[in-house]
Amino acid sequence: MSFTHGYADNHGLRMYYEIHGQEVPGLPPLLLIPGGGSTIGTNFGELIPLLADQRQVIAVEEEGHGRTQPTSRPLTAENSAGDILAVLDQLNVGAADVLGFSAGGHTAVALALTRPAAVRHLIAASTFVSRDAVPDGFWDAMARATLADMPYTYKDADRRLNPDAGHLERLFELDRQRILDFPGWSGDELGTITASTLVVCADRDVVSAEYAARMAGAIPGARLLIVPGGHGDYLGELAASGGDLRTMHATVPFLLRFLGEQGT
């Protein structure tokens, strides 16, 4: 499938984006935000053709990921939300439906909080909004993590796009520090989200289905979808799915049905 691409500038950060599919009258584009360590291809390469057949899709790569080069600033959900707003402004997109996966889900939530009018539907996939989402062992493991723990799929994709020495190491540290420093949001903050929201979680995900239900309960009117599988295979994420796309094909109709519902 052919696509167009470009960069949007935001205070020295040049965010890479791709546009797949054609504009659909009456429907905003669907914005995809990959998870940590990922590129558009590794996270959404299998999913985009299914979505772009029915919706125009804009996919981005956050700072240090893929074709978006790192700067000296930290990688945070709020910084990335600002970068994405620069993309939307450059493309004259006033509002979009947004799907953020994992750490990209943090950015999607930050976007919905930063500029509520920019997010019509929000799909928060395999993500969390508070530090109590995961046990203490998760944080201990993240603090001890090294590049050797990074999935080969991510390493290979980054080395092909960015063969210069030190880039992969910088990517890994940006992601690791981002998670370690993640503050989460209060219930009062989450209560201000105006986007129609769907919380998606797999039954063998990083967070539990019980936590996902609690997260959905904190966002006004949010819906909940629990799917079989692990962290991202239901989106065709390359490292998680290993090429088995059955869960993705079963999940997509539910996502499209939610996106087709009347927005706020």
Question: Which residues does each predicted region cover?
Answer:
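Catalytic active-site module of serine/aspartate enzymes centered on a nucleophile-bearing elbow/loop
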Residues: P228-T264
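Short beta-strand/loop motif that positions the catalytic acidic residue
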Residues: I193, V199-C201
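Active-site loop/oxyanion-hole signature of alpha/beta-hydrolase fold enzymes
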Residues: G45, P49-A52, I58-L99, S241-H249
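Conserved HGGG/HGGXW glycine-rich cap/lid loop of the alpha/beta-hydrolase fold
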Residues: H11-Q69
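Active-site nucleophile elbow and catalytic-triad environment of alpha/beta-hydrolase enzymes
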Residues: E173-E189
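N-terminal cap/lid segment of alpha/beta-hydrolase-fold proteins
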Residues: M1-R14
